[in-house]
Each structure stands twice: as C-alpha cells, then as structure tokens.
A protein has these predicted regions:
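Active-site glycine-centered loops adjacent to acidic/histidine catalytic or metal-binding residues
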Residues: 49
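A cross-family acyltransferase "interaction/gating" segment
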Residues: 10-13, 36-43, 54-121
Length: 148
C-alpha cells in the first residue's frame, strides 16, 4: 500500500505500478483491492502505524490493517521488526548513517483469531477493537524489546 502522493511522483510512479502496489487514495477502494489481493492467494504487508515511526513516541495506528483483515476474512499474522542501532526513522534523515552497522530482527507472532471480531456489530466497532488489539500487541512488543 502506497500513499496517494507517491503515485503522482514521476520518478516513483513507474516502479510503484510495476511492483503492484495499491494506492491509499480512496479507503473503500483500497480495502476492496487489498481483500481481492489476499483472496487471490497473495500476501500483503501492512504497517498500521505507517512505514516509519518516531522512536520513543507512542504508536498511532490507522484502522486500515484491521479493516483489510476483516474484509478479506484472512489469517492475520503480526510481525515485529526491530533495528539496532536505530536508523531510517521519521526524525532521522535517510542519509544519516549510524555509527555502527545496524542489525534488523524480525519476530513472527502467533496468528490472531479474527472470529470474535467478525461477530461484532456494527462492523466499525469490530475494526476499532481489532485495531486496539493490534496496538496493544505491538506496544507490548516494543516494551519487551526496549527492556533488553
């Protein structure tokens, strides 16, 4: 999923189209396109907080990831990415190289059971509750990471 402004960037547009990215210009269309993509057997990576966070600040999640998962009726697997030392964050210029080589770590969590959320009505409440569950999960992961 790519923010709509990048689709208008002449330097990026061709790469975005060729890579098969989905635009976030219209949320309803984005959710439909993502659900169709998942139901077609493809995978999808969604960063509910956006692609780059500011270290030390609390997460602010968008509801798109939850809305997509519920619309596609798919498996939702949380993945935590950590980077030491911190680099490529929103408050740091991309060309600022860390003083030592950085290491990326990926931790794949257990699948999240969506059945309880599918039963909630209205749908908007289910999306909000699932988003909150994701926020709680990743906040706990961040705290666990920061303690080590």
């Amino acid at each position: 999923i790519v923010k709509a402004s990048l689709w208008r960037n002449p330097a990026m547009r061709g790469s975005i189209l060729n890579a098969g990215y989905i635009s976030n210009a219209d949320s309803a269309t984005m959710i439909e396109d993502c659900a169709a993509w998942l139901n077609g057997g493809c995978g999808l990576i969604v960063f509910p907080e956006g692609t780059r966070t500011v270290p030390g600040q609390t997460y602010r999640f968008q509801r798109g990831a939850a809305a997509i998962a519920l619309a596609a009726d798919c498996v939702l697997t949380p993945v935590t990415l950590t980077c030491t030392p911190s680099t490529l964050t929103k408050n740091l210029a991309w060309y600022r190289i860390p003083p030592r080589r950085f290491h990326l770590r990926m931790e794949v969590g257990d699948d999240i059971d969506l059945a309880p959320y599918r039963q909630m009505q209205p749908h908007s409440i289910a999306v909000r509750r699932l988003t909150q569950s994701l926020l709680d999960y990743f906040t706990e992961q961040r705290l666990r990471y920061e303690q080590h």
